[in-house]
Amino acid sequence: MKKVLVTGGTGLVGKALEAVIKEQSPEDEQWFFAGSKDADLTNLAATQALFAREKPTHVIHLAAMVGGLFHNMNNNLDFLRNNLLINDNVLQTAHEQGCVKVVSCLSTCIFPDKTSYPIDETMVHNGPPHPSNYGYSYAKRLIDVQNHAYHDKYGRVYTSVIPCNIFGPHDNYNPEVSHVIPGMIYRMHQLVTEKTDVPENDKVFTVFGSGMPLRQFVYSRDLAELMIWVLRNYESVEPIILSADEVQEVTIFEVAQAVAKAFNFNGRLVCDTSKSDGQYKKTASNAKLRSFLPDYAFTDLETAINASVKWYIENYDQARK
């Protein structure tokens, strides 16, 4: 019987994993979704206590200090130190407790700022990351370094996945820390519901930055399905990119249009070019993933945004904001 511990299990991806596992009801696996209330993973003793209590054979490591572009830009040291602590505590404790496999979640932001496109798994360490979020990026890169070190010294199959921009139900909508899609959903909902005295055609929704940067997005449920596949079937320490196909890349302005459509918003969209764009593009190749799963069908962006907006409206009172 596998015992799977999910760190960061109450967040965006953890909730998606929980939903998929509930539907699958695997008879040979027990899953425990740990949140911050279960253990402070920056504390080694607390991490060890969690592992001793749950006795996992496998770990999906999602726990991290995370945030959007502007939160990262202002707090690089905190992102570096907290994530280094979390990752080292989880990986070392997993090893000490004899965990067979750990799948850690990285991010496409770890790739070099100056690079050729599309980026792939071989390019992680080819140069410094974008300066806007170097603290988070270097901490995440070191997971890959540690995975190789545990394999070299102990033969551990501790690996990592690199998703593109994740979104979906149970996201963090707090405007101070949110990523682009939940941030837009939060602000669009405010605009639509709180300014009822203003005719909708006169309302203006502001897109931060030029709207031109290109991004690939992955719906949290799709990522959950793929991470479960990695846990059960992918037997390499080398990272694997879990990203939608390159042809599904869209501009930030197109994302804003999709969010507006989901809210039936008929006002204007304007770009505030005084705000930073971050990296212009981060196009990732999913060729390795496609070599294993050539027929996997990603949820299209409009369908996924519609579902995310619907969840936010229906769960507004308990949504993280």
UniProtKB/Swiss-Prot annotation:
InterPro entries: Epimerase_deHydtase (IPR001509), GDP_fucose/colitose_synth (IPR028614), NAD(P)-bd_dom_sf (IPR036291). The record marks 107, 109 as: Important for catalytic activity. GO terms for cellular component: cytosol. Signal peptide: none annotated. The record marks 140 as: Lowers pKa of active site Tyr. The active site is at residue 136. Substrate binds at residues 187, 215, 277. Catalyzes the two-step NADP-dependent conversion of GDP-4-dehydro-6-deoxy-D-mannose to GDP-fucose, involving an epimerase and a reductase reaction. Belongs to the NAD(P)-dependent epimerase/dehydratase family. Fucose synthase subfamily. PANTHER family: GDP-L-FUCOSE SYNTHASE. This is Probable GDP-L-fucose synthase.
